[in-house]
Swiss-Prot record:
Its EC number is 4.3.2.10, 3.5.1.2. It comes from Herpetosiphon aurantiacus (strain ATCC 23779 / DSM 785 / 114-95). It holds the Pfam family GATase. This is Imidazole glycerol phosphate synthase subunit HisH. The gene is hisH. IGPS catalyzes the conversion of PRFAR and glutamine to IGP, AICAR and glutamate. The HisH subunit catalyzes the hydrolysis of glutamine to glutamate and ammonia as part of the synthesis of IGP and AICAR. The resulting ammonia molecule is channeled to the active site of HisF. It is found in: Cytoplasm.
Amino acid sequence: MIAVINYGAGNLPNAVRALEYVQAPIEVVTDPAAVRAAQAVVLPGVGATADTMRSLREMGMDSAIREVIARGTPFLGICVGMQVLAEQSEEFGLHECLGLVPGTIRRFDQGLKVPQIGWNGVQHDGSALWDGIPNGAEFYFVHSYYLATDDVALVTGRTEYGLNFPAAIARDNITAVQFHPEKSGQWGLKLLGNWVELALSRGSGVGDRA
């Protein structure tokens, strides 16, 4: 079973429909015990990192996420679900995040229109997550903040919006994307299908490059 964490994020129904479309064996969960028992975990999200972290802490999900990632359970973070993996966020003040990947969530430069809303191309590294997806394929973004990290090896996909920023990251069993695959048409569904296949067949190696 793939646990999809429900903490009140607005994009949950879209994420669920997309995962069901690619025939993922999902269960929407609010109980940390269900996350700990899952074969894989998805954290969708929209909104602010501070609000998301507050909700996760109140539910006891922050510790559950750390535990399952530490023991190798495949994990997919979407949009804010990617951002909360960072060490900290500068959104509405400095806030501590899960600290599972190196970096800080920072706002786009003041001269840019934010949030970035719409389609943008992703240059990817051709790893297994991107199998069958052309380099430069467009995905749907809605965000004002991005992951700033010095860990180049962490990044599997990049996008230009005022600067070159990480659109996707992967390490060991962690995979995360800044865009919304559930709103990104055929390539978003292809990416979700790839992740589901990797998560169910390769276990803790899902985030590895291939």
